């Protein structure tokens, strides 16, 4: 499927968990520029009340779609020590980039046993976040880059906005390092325009049972188990659509769906997303066909659910 310039821009914006303000501003600008061309113009909720999250309410919602805007990365500790944010792959020599009060940073990841360091020649401010250096590669079959998780989930949610008439589209934060924004977002949604079902627009993994070019992944379970009745309904609808899909059953992993399940609200949820190879590395790889089926499934389900 065609990859637009805004996705490429998103991939270049750092947003390590807890530092999502820049990507949120870019996303908000994109929404304001595009919304007049969408089938329905949403009500937009953002600002300090929502930290760096953005909520779009279209019409009379029945379903909410959640896509997290943060990424994994690293944080500078003391001297030249690093600690991970989320679960990045620890590959010695990986190039890391960032910025502190002294200026731009480009360095390499040094791994010594369980200890992590950078090799930048000067001191870096404590608490500085470092991201994988970005290299976007696109051919006729694949997109490969750092942070496809979850820039592609955000991209799919934005594509959904073009045709959506009734529903919530919500851009969340903190997900890669344990979550935290979902409780106040769910509370606001249920107080403003209540829904009983949620879809998680995120990226999952290529495994022995999930493969490139075989369609979007519907997750029956990861570490957490959504309600079978709702998952069965999702599967039945997607079967009727004719859109390619595959089913995932895993013992590990999690998403914003966890916080839906642990919330005080009786909401069903399902994780639906394309699968990537080389997870949480600078070289994440996703099939363009699978991304296309992801976009199609969300547009279909938001009409049918």
Regions found by a protein language model. Give the residues of each.
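N-terminal hydrophobic/helix-forming segments and targeting peptides
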Residues: 1-305
């Amino acid at each position: 499927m065609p990859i637009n310039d805004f996705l490429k821009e998103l991939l270049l914006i750092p947003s390590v968990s807890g530092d999502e303000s820049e990507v949120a501003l870019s996303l908000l600008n994109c929404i304001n520029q595009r919304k007049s061309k969408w089938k329905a113009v949403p009500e937009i909720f953002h600002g300090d009340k929502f930290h760096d999250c953005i909520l779009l309410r279209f019409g009379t919602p029945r379903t909410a779609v959640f896509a997290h805007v943060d990424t994994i990365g690293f944080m500078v500790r003391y001297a030249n020590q690093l600690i991970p944010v989320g679960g990045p792959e620890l590959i010695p020599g990986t190039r890391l980039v960032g910025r502190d009060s002294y200026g731009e940073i480009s360095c390499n990841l040094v791994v010594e046993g369980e200890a992590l360091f950078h090799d930048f020649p000067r001191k870096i401010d404590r608490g500085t976040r470092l991201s994988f250096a970005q290299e976007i590669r696109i051919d006729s079959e694949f997109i490969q880059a750092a942070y496809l998780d979850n820039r592609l989930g955000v991209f799919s949610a934005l594509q959904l906005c073009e045709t959506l008439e009734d529903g919530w589209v919500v851009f969340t934060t903190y997900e890669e390092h344990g979550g935290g924004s979902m409780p106040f977002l769910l509370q606001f949604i249920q107080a403003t325009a209540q829904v009983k079902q949620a879809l998680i627009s995120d990226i999952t993994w290529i495994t022995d049972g999930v493969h490139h070019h075989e369609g979007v992944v519907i997750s029956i379970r990861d570490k957490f188990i959504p309600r079978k009745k709702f998952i069965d309904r999702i599967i039945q609808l997607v079967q009727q659509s004719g859109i390619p899909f595959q089913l995932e059953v895993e013992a590990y992993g999690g998403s914003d769906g966890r916080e839906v399940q642990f919330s005080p609200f009786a909401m069903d949820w399902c994780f639906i997303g394309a699968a990537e190879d080389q997870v949480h590395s600078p070289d994440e790889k996703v099939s363009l066909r699978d991304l296309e089926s992801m976009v199609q499934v969300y547009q279909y389900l938001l009409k049918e659910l």
